Amino acid sequence: MLNIDQVLYVDSQIEHFSNHIIKQDTHYGQEIISESLMAKSTVGQQNRDRTKNDINTLTPLLSTNMQRSVNLSKEKGASSWLTTLPLKTHGFTLHKQAFRDALSLRYGWTPNKLPSKCACGSSFTVEHVLSCAKGGFPSIRHNEIRDLTADLLSEVCNNVCTEPELLPVTGENLAGASANIQPGARLDIAANGVWGGSFERTYFDVRVFNPHAASNRHTDPQTVYRKHEQIKKRAYEQRILDIEQASFSPLVLSATGGLAREATTFYKRLASMLVSKWDQSYSSTLCWLRCRLTFSLLRSLIQAIRGSRSSSGHPFRSGAIDLVISETHLHQ
């Protein structure tokens, strides 16, 4: 509810502008325009303050699980799937069950009609299935972000590739016990021209973590982001700097749509590069980019919950195809 001062302020502004409308005054000066913008800004700030106060009042009344889910949904871009128009031509739609599942995930509720057991034998909970490797869903989630990012980089950068193989370590001294010195090591994406000139190469490695996992759910999300960024840096950064003579950027995202600090910086940079290519405003391009990332993650979450885990990885049982064709006399 508005307090008395806010009500009086709004009423005075309405009366002020109504007088100009009644008089059909089309020659108002810059002063009126400035007052109009100021009034709009003031009312908007009052609404934001009121909403913030309501959130601060209601949040402590929620369960711990729901508090965490709500805080995750408040991260920048994590709720863009809910505020964008559901246009199928742009890929921003969910069918009705997926929409209900998305709302359940948003508020920490258990989606309806879930099985009691996972195909791996564990209890079927949201926390478990978002991390369960059976069926390959964590890899699908990771690859979706990798491929989307690589496709967008291809719009504005050169020499873009996925899963680039790193140069071998041949006697170089890499500090840190966790540094990856394995031959044939690969990262997710490499591109030229991201942070510098067209010959400056940058390597990226994507990590999408489950914020509801037992190892994460009792830790502040920002701390979890930093932890995963540091793991990636300790494994690859010095090798990239010293041997590849390039730069390294870890792209850490939560499965619920949030971004770590360096991922946020990178996607802002990518949006600014796409602006000049697509001739769009920076704010709308960044909003679109966040929405694409969020929808990709959201669909992968729903697939992990509703998808089948029973057949993935099972070999196709058949004889050699040439023998089958020969013995059965198959002809087109």
Which functions belong to the PLM regions below?
Residues 93-125, 148, 152-216, 225-231, ...:
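Active-site metal-binding core of divalent-cation-utilizing nuclease and nuclease-like domains
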Residues 1-109:
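Acidic catalytic cores of enzymes that act on phosphate-bearing nucleotides/polynucleotides
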Residues 253-332:
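Domain-level recognition of nuclease-like catalytic cores that cleave nucleotide substrates
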Residues 24, 152, 156, 160, ...:
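Generic recognition of well-structured, leucine-rich alpha-helical segments
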Residues 126, 136-143, 198, 223-230, ...:
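Intrinsic disorder
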Residues 208-257, 264-290:
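E2/UBC-UEV (E2-variant) core
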